[in-house]
């Protein structure tokens, strides 16, 4: 009893929701054995006959090829294609293929030579001694793909399964009407199919191997049972006929009771499924060493005189196969590649046979009925009841029609297997599968565009990050390469900072002078003497380096004297307006006096060392002397009228007096050394004398009209008087040194006499004013 229950549980099957029972129409083609078809004159081999990218071409136009020779290289998920016969490559160009869009794809066109010569074949009869990776690579390089309709590369599928596969399922259901390719293959080649199953089991090492076959194939079932009579590792499961029990998810649930998760794969639950035709192709690739160059194709339909199953070479035009089967087309003949529910209508008959071509259906006008007009959905829910994937086709229809991609995705449109059960039961004749296919294509295009945008954004962000890193590295290099100050520069900087700190410390100590006491100026005097010594040393260095040819310009000296007078006036005015509360710093006064004395000595020494190369113009000297005398008279008058209330700073007066004395000595020395070599033009002298008289008259008039309220600075007057005396002495010396050959101009003498008279009058007037 326990063994009976165990056997019952072992052979138990489950049923899925939905499904339909359309007319099978399989008896038209499953009664005749497989047969060969004569070779076509031309073969068109598309480079992409599988899910994934097309391979890389390894032939060119004009090449001679043999049957089984690779036309492309298979790398990664790229599956190679092989020459179906021997011949010559005449073209490599786009050609329409078996696709609902009828778009052209790159194809290799071969003209057959009729010899059908194979490449050297190397079979692995001892495949059990081969490593798993070697077998998978051989299957992949021999171009084996899923022949049940998906076209997924078998080698990639086996590689992805790895060691987690517990159940290997062989799909022999072949549930769609009209199609009998797998049925006939199992009847005629059952032993080869089982051998291919054993190779797959050797690669995957599953715990159990299940063959699922519908009960409408009695001959195939009997042939498989005969082959599996002595095998205990492979179980044959006969399931009820129901469409679409051949779907991967549906058959997995029927045989194991496990459901593939949404968005997942069967390998996630430890299940891997392969088709009967794929198992046969694996056997031929591994044991016989033959790449996939042909497959079984069902030729059926009332428009075909000799329906049946044939071995069709890949790349054979559909027209060639139909004509060989006695095709009798009508006026509006339709040819479907695949079954009536999941197949596609061919745009023309030059489309080639590919790896996923399992049936060519040529129905008559009465066989499928007249096409019905599409009507509005009445929401009868018949499509939802028939859906084997538990979807809501009516809702997906509305979302697809309204371009509501997000809602269609939310309602799991990706789980639709496009079986056509919903369209079969729809009373409104709505081609639901067409809407779903279009919606899936649009969603795939949107996701592809989003992926490109994300990749572009990632590249942009990576570029920005790289630029930022390069910028930071560049700045770091610049910082590290910056020139550091030398040791001597650091010492100089440190010394300067020390001096500044010392001065700041001295400035922060207030100087307090008590009444009746004299401050202790010993430190100040010592510092002053040190500075004086330093200044003398610097002056000696400068004198040694200066060129002996340096000439002192008396005009520059006069300008400097004028600038000194202006500064003196400004300081006196500021001191006069200053508040009496301001204290006088004795240290600063001493420093200024020392600086003035040093400048005076410097000027005297420069005057002594200057060479007398510069020539002095006696005419200019005469004019300057006259101007100086006029300014002296003006200053004397201003001093007489000056108010006695203005205070005088003795320090500044001493400084200015010292500077004036030095400048006067310099002028006297220059005048003494000047050579009167330049001849005097009597006309220029007359002009200058006239100008001097005019200036003298203007000065007398200004003095007469001057207001007595104007205050005169006695210090400035003293300085200017000293300068005037120096200039007068200079003029006298120049006149004394003049050569006797120079003629005396009577006009010049007259001018001088006039100037003397004016000066005498002015002196008398000033004397009277002073006495008053």
UniProtKB/Swiss-Prot annotation:
One CC-aspect GO term: plasma membrane
Region of interest (Disordered), residue spans: 599-748
Positions bound to [4Fe-4S] cluster 2: 387, 416, 419, 422
Membrane topology (UniProt): Peripheral membrane protein
Bound cofactor: record note: Binds 2 [4Fe-4S] clusters per subunit.
Span of domain 4Fe-4S ferredoxin-type: 369-397, 407-436
Cross-referenced NCBIfam families: PRK05035.1, rnfC
The protein's name in its UniProt record: Ion-translocating oxidoreductase complex subunit C
Organism: Shigella dysenteriae serotype 1 (strain Sd197)
Source organism phylogeny: Bacteria, Pseudomonadati, Pseudomonadota, Gammaproteobacteria, Enterobacterales
